[in-house]
Amino acid sequence: GFPIPDPYCWDISFRTFYTIVDDEHKTLFNGILLLSQADNADHLNELRRCTGKHFLNEQQLMQASQYAGYAEHKKAHDDFIHKLDTWDGDVTYAKNWLVNHIKTIDFKYRGKI
C-alpha cells in the first residue's frame, strides 16, 4: 500500500483534480484524524455522515458520466460504510483504507467523470 501521511492530513499527492471531491477528501482525512485522537460516538457519527455524503456525490458524478468502473467503486464504498457501521475502533484500518482507496480506486476516474 501507500505510506500513511504523518500528520494524517490531505496533501496534493491525493489530488483528483475535481474540487468538490478533493474538498470532501480533506474532510474525510480530518474526520479520521479526529477519530484517532478521540474514538467517541460524536466523531464516529460525523465521519459516517461525511463519508455517506461524499460517496453519494462521487457515485452521482460517476453515474452522470457513465463511468465504466462504477460497480467496483460502489462496492468499495459499501464495504467501507459497513466497516463504519460495525466500528471496532480500528483507526489504522480507516487511515489505510482512505489513503489506498484514493490513490488506487479514485485515481482511476481522473479525467473520466
From Swiss-Prot:
Pfam families per the UniProt record, alphabetical: Hemerythrin (PF01814)
Chain residues that bind Fe cation 2: 58, 73, 77, 101, 106
GO MF annotations in UniProt: iron ion binding; oxygen carrier activity
Protein name: Hemerythrin
Organism encoding this protein: Themiste dyscrita
Residues reported in the UniProt entry to bind Fe cation 1: 25, 54, 58, 106
UniProt-listed NCBIfam families: hemeryth_dom, Hemerythrin
Keyword annotations of the record: Iron, Metal-binding, Oxygen transport, Transport
Superkingdom of origin organism: Eukaryota
Assembly behavior: Homooctamer.
Primary role: Hemerythrin is a respiratory protein in blood cells of certain marine worms. The oxygen-binding site in each chain contains two iron atoms.
Similarity annotation: Belongs to the hemerythrin family.
